[in-house]
Amino acid sequence: IENEGSNPAGKGKDTNKEFILYSVYDQKTRPASIDLTQTLWKLTPSRKLIDMFVCTDGLPIDKSPKFQGYQKRGDEFKNRDYRLKSYIGTPDANTKLTGGNAGYTPYKFTLYGRNTTNKDEYSNYPVLRLAEVYLNYAEAVYERYGEITNEQLNKSINKLRGRAGVASLTNELVTENGLDMLTEIRRERTVELYMEGFRYDDLKRWGKLEEELNESRCGMV
């Protein structure tokens, strides 16, 4: 987010109203300790994460007729949740990404057009943001009552899905397509909070850590 051409609304970290608590980084008082575009090999996303992003109709890729498959490079990014292109580098990304060993590279928290080796990348890092509050609420409601109403989904998870250009998560969508509501709530948490340090502890909380970490790790097709 650098200029009027790429950011006509002038949005940036100084106008961010979503972060409730956050760590501030800038070139003078607190430079970043790593280069996001160069050294995040340990955060390289696998195809499993990529496949977790739903299509614009709100359905997982194995359920959605909108999924374009893997025939050509970039096909899998079409008709998908906007967060996929925001978080993962695409073949036409404006920021050149060189880290990664699975064919995918992390794009989240990078700056538009930057590709530096001098740590000149200064996005603030969230400690607590509004999206996490929404996700905590939806998960807590479902875990407590074994169900969640569409109204409760609309004031939590669907605020995130709407921003990402994805159809709302509803009880009807789940029932009509043979989905599981808890799985979809957890999916939303996983994709929204990618690279924010939650996944490992979430898997432990859900009793899924051993199962998930022992699966094969695949890269780009």
Whereabouts are the PLM-identified features?
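Short, electropositive, low-hydrophobicity segments enriched in small/polar residues
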Residues: D62
